[in-house]
């Protein structure tokens, strides 16, 4: 897992150069907007159980066959597994948002995700829809457009953070396709 600092240092080291110029300015911006980033992650993790349950509920409302006797969310065990998987995805997205780097998401969550679901017979479309619902909800929390939040959300313009967060969810959706 690389954070914004490690990524810059690794890049400079591979070129046998000092960190400076544009890289230093990018790190300065990363630090100056650190409180917004922390607030954005806090808004997500403080509402994680609601985000996950709403996403899974939305997926099921759009495809009620998932809770029929032959569906992938039928029985408490399968529903619990679905909620657990969505929670894991959200957790790794929050780690990526906190560090400003998607490598933890890619390395620990996305590798083999599609193949795992395919081997279990889980339809990718439903998973992608649940991820899309989580994406919309998290972007709403970060942009302060959601009315269903437990804590305050980041102050100021957080559109860049919202876009970054959306990009992490897009990576998950792409991994499922």
UniProtKB/Swiss-Prot annotation:
GO terms for biological process: photosynthesis. Mesobiliverdin binds at residue 18. (2R,3E)-phycocyanobilin 1 binds at residues 28, 35, 39, 154, 156, 158. It is a peripheral membrane protein. 15,16-dihydrobiliverdin binds at residues 50, 54, 61, 148. Its main location: plastid. It is found in: Plastid, Chloroplast thylakoid membrane. Pfam families: Phycobilisome. InterPro entries: Globin-like_sf, Phycobilisome_asu/bsu, Phycobilisome_asu/bsu_sf. Keywords: Bile pigment, Chloroplast, Chromophore, Electron transport, Membrane, Photosynthesis, Plastid, Thylakoid, Transport. The keyword Electron transport applies. (2R,3E)-phycocyanobilin 2 binds at residues 72, 77, 82, 84-85. Contains two phycocyanobilin chromophores, one mesobiliverdin chromophore and one 15,16-dihydrobiliverdin chromophore with binding mediated by both the alpha and beta subunits. GO terms for cellular component: chloroplast thylakoid membrane; phycobilisome. It comes from the Eukaryota. PANTHER family: C-PHYCOCYANIN BETA SUBUNIT, PHYCOBILISOME 32.1 KDA LINKER POLYPEPTIDE, PHYCOCYANIN-ASSOCIATED, ROD 2-RELATED. Light-harvesting photosynthetic tetrapyrrole chromophore-protein from the phycobiliprotein complex. The light-harvesting system in Cryptophytes contains phycobiliprotein complexes. Unusually they are composed of either phycoerythrin (CPE) or phycocyanin (CPC) but never allophycocyanin (APC), with only one type of biliprotein being present in any one species. Unlike cyanobacteria or red algae these proteins are not arranged into higher-order phycobilisome complexes, and they are found in the thylakoid lumen. Belongs to the phycobiliprotein family. Heterotetramer of 2 different alpha chains and 2 identical beta chains which form 2 alpha-beta heterodimers within the heterotetramer. This is Phycocyanin PC645 beta subunit. The lineage of its organism: Eukaryota, Cryptophyceae, Pyrenomonadales, Chroomonadaceae, Chroomonas.
